[in-house]
From Swiss-Prot:
Record's signal peptide: none
Gene name, Swiss-Prot/TrEMBL: fabH
Alphabetical list of HAMAP family matching this protein: FabH
E.C. number(s) listed in UniProt: 2.3.1.180
Keyword hit for tRNA processing: no
Comment field on protein domains: The last Arg residue of the ACP-binding site is essential for the weak association between ACP/AcpP and FabH.
Gene Ontology terms: biological process: fatty acid biosynthetic process; secondary metabolite biosynthetic process
Compartments, as annotated in UniProt: Cytoplasm
Protein name in UniProt: Beta-ketoacyl-[acyl-carrier-protein] synthase III
Domain of life of the organism encoding this protein: Bacteria
Organism in which the protein naturally occurs: Chlamydia trachomatis serovar D (strain ATCC VR-885 / DSM 19411 / UW-3/Cx)
SUPFAM superfamilies xrefs: Thiolase-like (SSF53901)
Amino acid sequence: MRASIWGTGSYLPKKILTNADLEKIVETSDEWISTRTGIKERRIASAEEFSSFMGAKAAEKAIEAAKISKSQVDCIVFSTAAPDYIFPSSAALAQAYLGIKEIPAFDCLAACTGFLYGLSIAKAYVESGMYQCVLVIAADKLSSFVNYQDRNTCVLFGDGGSACIVGHSRPGALEISKVNLGADGKQGDLLRLPAGGSRCPASQDTVQNHQHFITMEGKEVFKHAVRRMEFAAKTCITEAGLQEKDIDWLVPHQANERIIDAIAKRFAVKDSRVFKTLAKYGNTAASSVGIALDELLRTHDIHVAERLLLVAFGGGLSWGAVILQQV
């Protein structure tokens, strides 16, 4: 029996950082940001809203939506590129916050593709019979690693969390029909956080050289994002025995409107069926696709047999596609 999503949830901080706000702290303008990214505002977490907290709050909503109790969860997979600590894991911290029993809980790092990687792990666990009810969380507080003097990156990122419950297929659930994932470490330098790990530990020099902020080669990342997501999506569709016309909704990673539009043009999906949250939340990294999926399910009726195509791309480089079908 295939694995399915029983319920979803999301969490967004209350603080809003608009393009007008950014005009006051860096050389940029609302027009410059809007035309190049499609972003109008983004949410910024407070000091108390760290990644594990946002993920746990999203998880509470997913558990409620799935109509299960916390005691039924038997594994937690937490995707994040901005963990609270190198260790303990954000998964373990979220587990403690939620008051869930002592079940397996671990982090997954696939940057902005993290939600799809988490779904893939949960699908494998459920379909193998290893676990029955997996909580997938994706949350990132990237504002902690954004240089607000770098207009090429500070305009892009926002904070947030998303979650879903994955179990065996049941009526009203979203069946995880097919998954395609990939990575290319040879291109890792295109999008990274240079310091703070074992290769380049934190030091006075790394702080002075601003090496604890996100760096990105924008033009190269754009090209890879479009090409890799298109490949993953088309491979996923083919392996599922489907055609592009069989896709009813496209739910892409909310990185940049130009990237989203470039992907949408490559598929036979109407503009009205390309779901976007980018303008109001910006790029929320690993949580991006999960937030968009949760909002889509809360604001639209997904009919039986309709198919959703989720696509994402992130640092690593990493990319992926997932096909969901309403049952």
